[in-house]
Curated annotation (Swiss-Prot):
InterPro entries referenced in this protein's UniProt entry, alphabetically: EF-GSTs, Glutathione-S-Trfase_C-like, Glutathione-S-Trfase_C_sf, Glutathione_S-Trfase, Glutathione_S-Trfase_N, GST_C, Thioredoxin-like_sf
Pfam families membership: GST_C, GST_N
Gene Ontology BP, a term: translational elongation
Positions of the GST C-terminal domain: 90-219
Listed CDD domains: GST_C_EF1Bgamma_like, GST_N_EF1Bgamma
Disulfide bridge partners, by residue number: none
Function summary: Glutathione S-transferase-like protein; part of the gene cluster that mediates the biosynthesis of the mycotoxin lucilactaene and the lucilactaene-related compound NG-391 that act as cell cycle inhibitors with potent growth inhibitory activity against malarial parasites, moderate growth inhibitory activity against cancer cells, and no activity against bacteria and fungi. Within the cluster, LUC7 and LUC8 encode proteins which are not commonly involved in the biosynthesis of secondary metabolites and are not essential for lucilactaene biosynthesis.
Protein name per the record: Glutathione S-transferase-like protein LUC7
EC number(s) from the headed UniProt entry: 2.5.1.-
Length: 219
């Protein structure tokens, strides 16, 4: 069977895991195209398909061209037998799922990225950015901790795209920032995160848990 579509992105990309997880649940084969960031996305051929030059970007076997990770994840979530589970079985549930996706996009991922990029050598360290980003990430984790207390999943009683988006947004945070001492502060978040990435149907996408013991600090 031919792939459902192809994905353009550098790997690993924290915005891609939710896409591949949704595709895997729905039994959709996605081809990961060989890609060199800041080279391939600047070519005339790429810009003709995706004028903004952003990745991830999706090209469907039917010719659909779709940038923006949340849009791609939603499209793949809606394109198979798990669509109602992933996106909600009624309007209220769908809205709640969208609420949490927006939360991770605005309140988690940008601050996580600020904390990670200097630790992996992509950007120089800046103390002001570090302080603000850590405070914002811990605030978001506190919101999540309170919501997840007594809950198995973010919305309702089954895995949804909100959970896949959340786990994707926090994957690098657990690898580089949320160390053992932090994890003690947010036990419900940790339990939910592990439950999500260890779900049988998607665990190959996320890989085994990679939890940092002590986060790197600038000297």
């Amino acid at each position: 069977m031919a792939p459902f579509g192809r994905l353009y992105s550098f790997m690993p990309n924290g915005r891609v895991f939710k896409i591949l997880a949704a595709a895997t649940l729905n039994g959709l084969e996605i081809e990961i195209t060989p890609y060199q960031h800041m080279v391939d996305n600047k070519t005339p051929e790429f810009r003709a398909k995706f004028p903004a030059g952003k990745v991830p970007a999706f090209e469907g076997a039917d010719g659909l061209l779709l940038p923006e990770s949340d849009a791609i994840a939603q499209y793949l979530a809606q394109s198979g037998p798990y669509s109602e589970q992933l996106l909600g079985r009624d309007a209220a549930t769908s809205a709640k799922i969208r609420q949490w996706i927006s939360f991770f996009d605005g309140e988690v991922y940008p601050h996580m990225l600020d904390l990670v990029i200097w630790r992996v050598g992509i950007a120089p360290f800046d103390q002001s950015t570090e302080t603000k980003a850590l405070a914002r990430l811990e605030f978001a984790l506190d919101v999540l901790e309170k919501h997840l207390d007594g809950r198995k999943w973010l919305v309702g009683d089954e895995l949804t795209l909100a959970d896949l988006t959340g786990a994707s947004s926090l994957l690098w945070a657990f690898m580089h920032i949320i160390d053992a001492s932090e994890r003690k502060r947010f036990p419900s978040v940790v339990a939910w995160y592990l439950r999500t990435i260890e779900t049988e149907e998607v665990k190959e996408v996320f890989g085994p848990p990679n939890l940092i013991d002590v986060k790197r600090v600038h000297e």
